[in-house]
Structure formats: structure tokens, C-alpha cells
Amino acid sequence: MVCPKVVILSEGADLDSLSAAYGVLKLYPDAYLLKPKHLSKKAGEVFKKYRDKFRVIEDLPDCFELVLVDTHFLPEGLPRERIKRIIVYDHHPIGDVKEFEGKIEKVGAATTLVVEEIKEKGIDINPRDATLLAFGIYEDTGNFTYEGTTPRDALALAFLLEKGANLREIREVVMETYTPEQIEAVGKIVQSIEKVFINGRQISFATAVLERYQPDINTLLYEIKDLKESDAFFVIIEAEGKTYVFGRSQSEDVDVGEILSHFGGGGHREAGAVKLENVSAERIKELIKAFLKRKYVKLKVRDIMNTPPFVLEEHVSVKDALTELSERGIANAPVINREGKLVGIISKKALLKLVKLYPDEPIELFVNRDFYTLSPDAPVWEAEEILTKFGQKLIPVVEDGTVVGVVTRLDILQAVKEDLEKLKEKRRKIKVPENIEEIAREVGQIAKEMGLRAYIVGGVVRDILLGKEVWDVDFVVEGNAIELAKELARRHGVNVHPFPEFGTAHLKIGKLKLEFATARRETYPRPGAYPKVEPASLKEDLIRRDFTINAMAISVNLEDYGTLIDYFGGLRDLKDKVIRVLHPVSFIEDPVRILRALRFAGRLNFKLSRSTEKLLKQAVNLGLLKEAPRGRLINEIKLALREDRFLEILELYRKYRVLEEIIEGFQWNEKVLQKLYALRKVVDWHALEFSEERIDYGWLYLLILISNLDYERGKHFLEEMSAPSWVRETYKFMKFKLGSLKEELKKAKENYEVYRLLKPLHTSVLLLLMLEEELKEKIKLYLEKLRKVKLPKEKIEELKKQGLKGKELGERIEELKREIMNKI
């Protein structure tokens, strides 16, 4: 039985609900609207006028799929047994429907979500459709002035205006109107807003790059809430080769007319403007920010504090509090009561002592209640005085009784360090390889248009600096990486594979494999566990990485394209050929990094830094490899197998005794070592002489490694490794047949006998046999000559003319081949 979709509106549904419902009818040809009992005044008027556009039913069918718009509260009195599925399009976070399909996302109007899907699916709409859909977005965003309005709402509306939405009719029903170009410009401005605090004042910056300048755009600026609520703001619009700057101020301290006069413009304290040529919006923004800092800056606590802060609640037990601090690598934390008010500070050092005696007691019994706090607008020198003169390790930053941040000595040192780095211009330019140059610049352009920042990151930066060819490129985006990837894919007409739960997307353009990821921070709930992930800055994204040489980035943003970003000395370590972890608990957070460190050291012929080596040994001795996810360890060994310098990696495995922790029953011995080095010579010879017959030689090294294990253990390990069938067959042959074959080969006097014994064998077995010194020449002879012996076609035809066929012919051919081989 086919169950139709039925849209049911909530009691008193508004214009956004009605517009979204109509959009659902466009999305689903089998959808109907249950005749609404009561609508808001505007929605009722529109429904009456557009009644012919809606497919309406008055009674619910025996079975149906329920569609909810602008809500995900289940209407009362519904026959739930008839509902087969629930679909939701809502922008409110609260609701009682738990299992559903569809979208609940933070936008200004539910209709926006439906319009996005209509656009994505390429569903055709006419001007009347577009008008009906536009009603909801205009109303629920309050003419784009409500706090919840997003760039997505503006872009959805721009799409509807392109489809012919009737502005006159919209104005009559809802509002004053703007052009599609103005709406698109507003979307870009809202998306790019950046807030900074200078001398305790919030100053906002926004930029937009437009095809054509919109003459009345400045009249819209006060309608943008985030700008309107700033003490001052600067909106910078780049269009048709010119850059327009508008400044507005509501603060006695910030005279925008005077500021813009330094750039050739003018005005008064409350408003100013300037028009410039041949200079980008981003460049002007940075120049204005630099000017403001020189003129006004007196560094405040809010400029350097960590926010949002990690806090503990006073009822948490000593044991749980210690776990929380340990997982996050935090030494001290503010403690709050159930009302969210600050009551004290607790340290990890104190908890380590208390956990032995009072593990289950609440921390409110032990917090330090004698401490200093600061407001966000306090000068930094006050923080420095508290930290140095009074010995307090952490300062809670409190505003209106709420902890809004924390400051440590490290924050002050870091602020000074960053200022010095800027003064010294330590960042250097890197030449982006030609094969990725075009895409990199395009990503930078798209990022600029979307108000994002994008960077090439990680191992690809390392390989670029080492002069290696790169075809797999990882980008990190400060902002929505998936949307950037989708736009790049759209421009190239390729598919994109988004993974919203991870904030990543993959796509392929020509030979290039591209991965985009939203900048994120990670915390590990326990050693080796998969991390908890949340959005962050580029710096926080880089600091979560494994080693300094993998924690560099190259900007692809137009204003600083090609700039190397190296917060942790990765370039220096690359030059010094050193593997160095970024922080002391790196191997504890993720023990798989032990194997990664050794893989990179072996591959690049680098050494571990002294501190990294010490930390690695400690992690191995603590048995952390046994706690790591088995699948990730196995995968890391498989990656090592593919390395050209796998033997060097194995030597490092041996040096730091890691395989003993991973493979049950494994032990190194001198015989295994000798075979490994003998195998290298054999492999090098085979790869050179028979390049067309190359196999994955890494598996041969692995077979030698596990040769001393009992068969079942070795077999199980190969199964874990998902070893190819030829590897497993070779291992079985090694354990049960190789010994007897060696003896037969040693006894073989004729070349033909050698040929007969070796012909059925896989190349892997032949190479393993060459490890026996007295068999090496026989195997070489077979590979180079014996297996190539064939009778000329003429000779075979002659035998056939003699009346030989079938088995007799085969036996005669073998006799002749035997004669030839034995003469070699």
C-alpha cells in the first residue's frame, strides 16, 4: 500500500510555515496539505489568495508519511499508528520528535531549508511559486534584521528573486523590498563579519566582493544586527576595480571620520566614507585594523584570555574532576556552583593528592576560595601582576558574575611572542607546486567570496618543502569546509562526498585528490581512544597534530597566498632531520603515534628528538600500545609495509620493542635479523632484473618477521592484516612445505629437476628460497633462463607431423626441453 506524504501545520501557523509547506509540495509530488484549521492573519490571507496552488485534503488517509515544517512538536490527537515516517524541516532547536528524516538547522526561516533543497535538486519553479516561497523568508527574518538571520537566508531569497518572485506583491504582503543584488550583498556582508576588541570597544569589520557596486547598499548596513550592536563598524565593498569603505560609530572614543581621513576619505565622528582604487577589501581591512591598534590599543585581558573557559561544577567528585583535567591537559580550572557563579579554583596537583583519600567527595570541599579575578576590560599588566607577584596559576575572567575566560602566564607569553613574530616578519613565502597552483588559488578565491580562510596543511606541506611531488592535497578551512568544497565541485562539475559528522568533504579534480576539513580541536577521553572533535582556529587545528613537521600550513588566501605558517618550528626540524612531538602527552593521547613516529623516522631517515625519544620509550613501557584501537595499529603497520625503507622502519620497531606489544608471542632473534637483511639484497636484485614482475615486497619482510610464531598465531595476525591470498598461501607453504622443498632442491642434480620443482611456485616462495645461500644460484638460473626455455613452433609442428598428439606429444616436448635445460 502506497502511503502519501501529508503536511500538517501547527495551530496558528505563520507565513513561514505556509511557505515551507508549499515548498514541500514542490519537493514531493505525492505530498498533500491537510487543510489548516487556523492560520495567522497574514498566512490566512495568502492561503486564500493562493488556494489553487495547494494540493489540499480534508481527512487523513489510512496510512501516511507525516511532514512537519517550522516545528518538530508532534500535533496532538494524531492517529500515530497510521504514521509510517516523519520528515521535518525546522529551524527551531526544541521539539519532541526524536526519530525523523529531514533537517533541523540554525537558519532564519524554515522555508530557507526547503528552498535550498529545491535549488539543489533542480526543481523548476515559476515566478508565482517563487513569490509564495519568498513570503516566509521575508517575514521570519524580519526583513533580515532579526538576530537569527543567516547568510543562507539571504542566498535562498536571492535565488527566489532570480526565479521572478514578485517584489511588489511581497511588499504589499510583508515588507519594503530590496533588489536581488542588494540581498546577495547583504548575505556576503553578514557572512564575513569579524569582531575585534580595541581599547575595550567592540569594532566589527565586514567585507564583500561584488560584480557591480550597489549604490544604496550603505542604507542597509544599520539593518544588520551584528553591525548595529557594535560600538563601531567598517564595511568594505570591492566592486568593478574600486573599493568602498563605510564607517559608523556609536562610541565617543572612536571617530570614524578622522580614521578614514588617513586613507583619503572623511566624515565626522559618527559616519565616514572613502573610495579607493587598486587595493583589495582584505588589504584595506588589515590597514584599518593596524591603524586602530596603533592609535587606540591598550592590551586588555579579553584580548589574550582563553574563551570559552573549561569549568568544573562544585558537585563533581574528586575522581571525575581529575579525569576531566587529565583528558584535556589542564592544570587548573575555575569551579562554579549550580547557578553558574564562580566559587573557587581547583588544581590538578591538589586533586592528585586528594584522589587517594577522598575520590568520591565533591570538589566543593577542597576548592581554593582565596583568589583574584579580573574583568575582560582589565589591562593585561594587572593579570601579569597577579600571576607573578601573588603566585596565582590561573585567573578567572568574570563578567556579570559569570566566568567568560581564563588567563595563565602562558597566555601572556604567547601574546608577546606573537607580537614579536609579527614585528620580525618571520613568515616566509613558499612556492606552491605547479600541478596544484591553479586549484590552490581557486580555493583561496572561493574562501574570500565566502568569508572563510583556507590553508594547505599537514603532510602535503612537509612533502612540498622536501621537493616531493604531491597529488593528494589536504585543506583546512576556518569556517564551513563542506560548503567551500561543494562550491569548488560545482565550478568543476565533479561530485563531492561530504561527511557532515566530521566536518570534512572529499573530491577529485583530474589527478588531484582533495580533502577539505573544518579546523577543529580534539580531546581524547582515554589513551588511544577516538577523539572528541569541535570547531577551532587554524592554530588549534595544527597543535592537535602528531609532529612538528606535519603541523605546518601554507595559506591559499589571496592576501597572503603562499605564506608558510609554522607555529611549532616544523621547518627547523625538517632541516635538522628531526621527528618531534608537539606536546608531552602526545603518545599518551594517541599511542598509534608511536608507530607513526618510527615510520616517518625510517622513511625520511630522520632521528627522534631527545625528548620525543624519552616520551616514546615511556609510552611503550607503560603498555599503551596494548590499549590503542587494534584496527588503527594494524593499519599503521600496513602503511609501513608500503614504504621503500620498510627495513629501516623494522629496525626502529626492534630498537624500541614495539612489535612485542602488538604481536602476541613475537620475539626478535639474530636469525630473523640476518634473514631480513639477506631478503633486502634479494628484493633489490629482483626489482632491478624483473621490474615487470614486482610484488609487494613488504609482505615478504612481514613473513620473515612472523616465521618463528606458531602457525595459528601467525595465521591470525595475517588475517588481522587482511593479507592477500598469496601472502597467506606463502605463509602456509613456509610453515609446512618449505623445509622439504629445500632438501629436494639441494639434492637436484639436473637443471630440469630444478625447473620441475620451482615451476608451480609463486614468486614470493622463490625469493624466500634465495635466502638459502646454496640455493641462490639455482633460483637465479630458473628465473633468468630455465623458465624461459620453449620449443620453437616449427619443432612442435614437426612432432605433430610424426603423429604425436595429446599426452605423447606433451611428454616428448618435456623430454626435449629437459635436454635443452640440462645443457645450460
From Swiss-Prot:
Keywords: ATP-binding, CBS domain, Magnesium, Metal-binding, Nucleotide-binding, Nucleotidyltransferase, Repeat, RNA-binding, Transferase, tRNA processing, tRNA-binding. InterPro entries: CBS_dom, CBS_dom_sf, DHH_sf, DHHA1_dom, NT_sf, PolA_pol_head_dom, tRNA_nt/polyA_polymerase. It is an enzyme of class 2 (transferase). It holds the Pfam family DHHA1. Its cofactor is Mg(2+). The keyword Kinase does not apply. SMART domains: CBS. It catalyses: a tRNA with a 3' CC end + ATP = a tRNA with a 3' CCA end + diphosphate. Its EC number is 2.7.7.-. Residues 305-363, 367-423 form the CBS domain. GO terms for biological process: tRNA processing. GO terms for molecular function: ATP binding; ATP:3'-cytidine-cytidine-tRNA adenylyltransferase activity; metal ion binding; tRNA binding. Mg(2+) binds at residues 472, 474. ATP binds at residues 459-462, 545-546, 550, 590-599, 603, 632. SUPFAM superfamilies: CBS-domain pair, DHH phosphoesterases, Nucleotidyltransferase, Poly A polymerase C-terminal region-like. Disulfide bonds: none annotated. tRNA nucleotidyltransferase involved in the synthesis of the tRNA CCA terminus. Adds the terminal adenosine residue to tRNA. Can incorporate CMP into tRNA ending with C74C75 (tRNACC), with very weak efficiency. Adopts a seahorse-like shape and consists of four domains: head, neck, body, and tail. Belongs to the tRNA nucleotidyltransferase/poly(A) polymerase family. This is A-adding tRNA nucleotidyltransferase. It comes from Aquifex aeolicus (strain VF5).
